[in-house]
């Protein structure tokens, strides 16, 4: 895995089982219109997420390569240009670099509903990885 930038960018994440449980919980609300952004808290930065992923997948990399943002965005623009010239969709692009390095942190008012998620964010990430990378899939 190659980190772009410092890895301190914050990410808000929602685990699908927790979202499902919240929807079930919301069926008990009195009638009316309710609008929620659902995210599991606490938010994590990319360094924390990568640490959980490596630990769960038992990845032991000696070298943790970090590419400075300015270099990655230049490579992204080069990839954009090459993709445009050859009419090919290239896996790296300036937009993907920007999205990866951006903070995607959202507030949630779910806590005001007395809902308690049954899965912590770390547990949710581990369960997702174990499912996605299991041999029985």
Regions found by a protein language model. Give the residues of each.
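Short small-residue beta-strand/loop micro-motif enriched in glycine and branched aliphatics
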Residues: 1-4, 109-110
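Active-site loop of classical SDR/Rossmann-like NAD(P)-dependent oxidoreductases
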Residues: 46, 91-108
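Aromatic-glycine-rich donor-binding/catalytic loop that engages nucleotide-sugar donors
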Residues: 113-117
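Mid/C-terminal beta-alpha module of Rossmann-like enzyme folds, strongest
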Residues: 25-89, 120-137
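Residue-level detector of conserved, well-ordered beta-strand and adjacent loop positions
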Residues: 4-5, 39
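Short aromatic/basic micro-patch
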Residues: 10-13, 43, 105-106, 118
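Substrate-positioning beta->alpha
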Residues: 5-27, 34
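Residues in well-ordered alpha-helical elements
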Residues: 17-20, 47, 109, 122
């Amino acid at each position: 895995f190659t980190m772009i930038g410092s890895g301190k960018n914050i990410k808000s994440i929602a685990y699908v089982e927790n979202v499902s449980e919240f929807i079930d919980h919301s069926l008990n609300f009195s009638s009316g219109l309710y609008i929620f952004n659902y995210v599991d808290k606490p938010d994590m930065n990319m360094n924390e997420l990568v640490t959980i992923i490596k630990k769960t997948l038992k990845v032991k990399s000696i070298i943790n390569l970090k590419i400075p943002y300015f270099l990655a965005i230049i490579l992204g623009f080069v990839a954009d240009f090459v993709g445009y010239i050859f009419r090919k969709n290239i896996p790296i692009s300036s937009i993907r670099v920007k999205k990866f390095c951006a903070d995607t942190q959202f507030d949630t008012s779910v806590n005001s509903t007395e809902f308690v998620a049954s899965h912590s964010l770390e547990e949710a990430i581990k369960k997702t990885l174990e499912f996605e990378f299991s041999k029985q899939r």
